[in-house]
């Protein structure tokens, strides 16, 4: 089988930097899928992406589809011909569909009779004839939320397309994609190298772009270069570069030929909280801040230029000039904010609505204050500090700094609280109330901060559900899914003895008559328990394990987690499958019983040795495991219950549960009821597959 390397490049105007990597990887995945569906073998598909191009390269791509043998069975011979031996309409219709006459059909003899059959070999198409359609479909299926048209064209794409290049080995593929004729022209860097040049082979692409066009098309190569140079520059300044993955990807998406440089700002700006300065550098300017070995911000930053002059002085000074006004603004806002205490901003919260039916931010802080105190009392935190932090929790939203730099909410509250002389735990809680901000984020460290974070999240969940505005589909304007999962993480990972029903009920009471949903407690609890499923699935825990625990609806998250871990462990035991099946059988038997099923076992009615053995073991385990269940030691309990396997198997082999004698029948049902209740103290293991 002969192969060639295949290249496809789509040359565009500047692509959205935050979406570039996602578009490029999706393009490569789509091409892979299309090649597989076409039956074309290949070694691998590589992707390339720069601000003005998306490209893929399929290595070792077969030059043609393999031939396929087909066999289409038609009607039975007895039904294919009439009494005169002429083809029936059924036979003729089948033959027509196969592109043959009935006379050309072969015969297939089977043990069920003789059938008409059409056998043929379909030659595979040359790969080059398929490539335009493969790339067109791959582009059409990219995750682009908003398309655009350009010029007088009707075609749509994320940005205007100016060049399309498709090479299969050394052959330029003819055709048109997105309204652009395929050509051997590739565009270089906008300012460096050749603006346009031609290539004659798929394997020339990367080298020609670098040498002629001054473009490093390999996204990962540019990224690695930026990272290495940034770390090198930071080390030279005696510091460490703060390089977040998302920002690094975005910067990589903004440049075609990266030139990593450093610049500085006046040391006087270091009097402003570092978070505000970093917010400006990262968010607005896409700079990498530099910290010293003690974690203090240095008056230097790293930036990446898309041009590479011999003397970079003008570029460096230009970036310093651009960032200076933003840092000056931050300095002014900070100094102005310090003139008023956080507590004195409380009245202004009355002018800002949290939600029309739920009142103002001042109303919300009053509720957070009360609920944080309740939570603190339950988890052993300082109640007064939790209430104080709850009271001040939203005051920094009224400051100039947070109004201008919104992502500094919380952290500026902490700095202003420290300036006001508030207790350190109170100050830190003002920042940590928003944790975790995203999946995998760290949790509040102190119990005071946990109290405020939970109070804030439960207030939002209860309030929004309480007015009937639960999330629908992907819409979640109040970020209730994040609030629910964040709350669960705090309670589980901090092992806090909190009950969801209790917290929602207390939260709902603080709204007075504002809530209109009478089922708000159940709705919020069910919503939060539903978040567990996604969490545990991400950890690789089987869905049936989660469902087994959900069937019992435990409302204490830490307890829920302990049950899931126990059932997940139980599922690995040799006896698990048999006991799950036995529990399913028990459930089915008991479900058919009319009226209440007793749990009283009458030893005098135990006849068979097997039922005596099971009854005694169940009664013994009930006594033995009572403290184990009470302490939430579910794995220990299930390990002991696993010892029931042989006894249960013997019982079902030898004992007729639904005996004719009513007393025997009820007594045996009572044994099974007690058996099932033992397992139900952990989960419904009959759900396990």
UniProtKB/Swiss-Prot annotation:
Record PROSITE patterns: AA_TRNA_LIGASE_II_GLYAB
Transmembrane portions of the chain: none
Reaction catalysis annotation: tRNA(Gly) + glycine + ATP = glycyl-tRNA(Gly) + AMP + diphosphate
One GO biological process term: glycyl-tRNA aminoacylation
Pfam families: DALR_1, tRNA_synt_2f
Cellular component annotations (GO), alphabetically ordered: cytosol
NCBIfam families recorded: glyS (TIGR00211)
Protein's UniProt name: Glycine--tRNA ligase beta subunit
Record lineage: Bacteria, Pseudomonadati, Pseudomonadota, Gammaproteobacteria, Pasteurellales
Gene: glyS
């Amino acid at each position: 089988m002969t192969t060639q390397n295949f290249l496809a490049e789509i040359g565009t105007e500047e692509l959205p930097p935050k979406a570039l990597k996602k578009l490029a990887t999706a393009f490569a995945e789509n091409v892979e899928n299309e090649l597989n569906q076409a039956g074309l073998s290949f070694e691998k598909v590589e992707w390339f992406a720069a601000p003005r191009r998306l490209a893929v390269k399929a290595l070792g791509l077969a030059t043609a589809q393999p031939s396929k043998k087909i066999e289409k069975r038609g009607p039975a011979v007895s039904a294919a011909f009439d009494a005169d031996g002429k083809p029936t309409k059924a036979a003729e219709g089948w033959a027509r569909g196969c592109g043959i006459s009935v006379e050309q059909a072969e015969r297939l003899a089977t043990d069920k009779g003789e059938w008409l059959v059409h056998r043929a070999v379909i030659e595979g198409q040359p790969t080059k004839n398929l490539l335009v359609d493969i790339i067109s479909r791959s582009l059409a299926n990219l995750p682009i939320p908003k398309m655009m048209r350009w010029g007088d064209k009707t075609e749509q794409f994320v940005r205007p397309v100016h060049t399309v290049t498709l090479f299969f080995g050394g052959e330029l593929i003819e055709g048109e994609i997105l309204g652009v004729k395929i050509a051997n022209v590739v565009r270089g860097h906008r300012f460096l190298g050749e603006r346009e040049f031609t290539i004659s082979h798929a394997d020339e692409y990367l080298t020609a772009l670098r040498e002629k066009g001054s473009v490093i098309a390999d996204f990962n190569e540019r990224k690695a270069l930026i990272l290495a140079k940034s770390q090198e520059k930071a080390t030279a300044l005696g510091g460490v570069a703060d390089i977040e993955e998302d920002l690094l990807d975005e910067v990589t998406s903004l440049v075609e030929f990266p030139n990593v440089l450093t610049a500085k700002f006046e040391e006087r700006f270091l009097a402003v909280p570092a978070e505000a300065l970093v917010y400006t550098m990262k968010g607005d300017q896409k700079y990498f801040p530099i910290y010293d070995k003690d974690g203090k911000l240095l008056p230097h930053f790293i930036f990446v230029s898309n041009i590479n002059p011999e003397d970079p002085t003008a570029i460096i000074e230009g970036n310093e000039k651009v960032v200076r006004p933003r840092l000056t603004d931050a300095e002014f806002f900070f100094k102005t904010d310090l003139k008023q205490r956080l507590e004195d901003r409380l009245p202004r919260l009355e002018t800002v609505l949290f939600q029309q039916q739920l009142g103002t931010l001042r109303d919300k802080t009053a509720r957070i204050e009360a609920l944080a105190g309740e939570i603190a009392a339950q988890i052993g935190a300082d109640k007064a500090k939790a209430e104080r932090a709850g009271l001040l929790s939203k005051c920094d939203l009224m400051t100039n700094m947070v109004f201008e730099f919104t992502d500094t909410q919380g952290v500026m509250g902490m700095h202003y609280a420290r300036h006001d002389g508030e207790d350190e735990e109170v100050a830190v809680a003002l920042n940590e109330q928003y944790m975790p901000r995203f999946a995998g984020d760290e949790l509040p460290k102190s119990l005071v901060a946990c109290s405020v974070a939970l109070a804030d999240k439960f207030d939002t969940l209860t309030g929004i559900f309480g007015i009937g505005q639960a999330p629908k589909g992907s819409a979640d304007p109040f970020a209730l899914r994040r609030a629910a999962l964040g709350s669960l993480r705090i309670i589980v990972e901090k092992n806090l003895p909190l009950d969801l029903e209790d917290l929602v009920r207390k939260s709902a009471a603080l709204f007075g008559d504002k809530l209109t949903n009478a089922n708000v407690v159940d709705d919020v609890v069910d919503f939060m328990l539903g978040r567990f499923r996604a969490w545990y699935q991400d950890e690789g825990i089987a869905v049936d394990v989660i469902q087994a625990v959900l069937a019992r609806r435990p409302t204490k998250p830490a307890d829920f987690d302990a049950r899931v871990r126990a059932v997940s462990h139980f599922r690995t035991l040799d006896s698990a499958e048999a006991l799950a099946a036995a529990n399913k059988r028990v459930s089915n038997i008991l479900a058919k019983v009319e009226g209440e099923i007793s749990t009283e076992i009458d030893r005098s009615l135990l006849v068979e040795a097997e039922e005596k053995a099971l009854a005694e073991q169940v009664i013994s385990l009930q006594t033995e495991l009572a403290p184990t269940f009470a302490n939430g030691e579910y794995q220990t309990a299930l390990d002991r219950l696993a010892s029931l396997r042989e006894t249960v198997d013997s019982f079902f082999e030898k004992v007729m549960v639904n005996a004719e004698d009513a007393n025997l029948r009820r007594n045996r049902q009572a044994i099974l009821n007690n058996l099932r209740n033992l397992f139900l103290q952990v989960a419904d293991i009959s759900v396990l597959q």
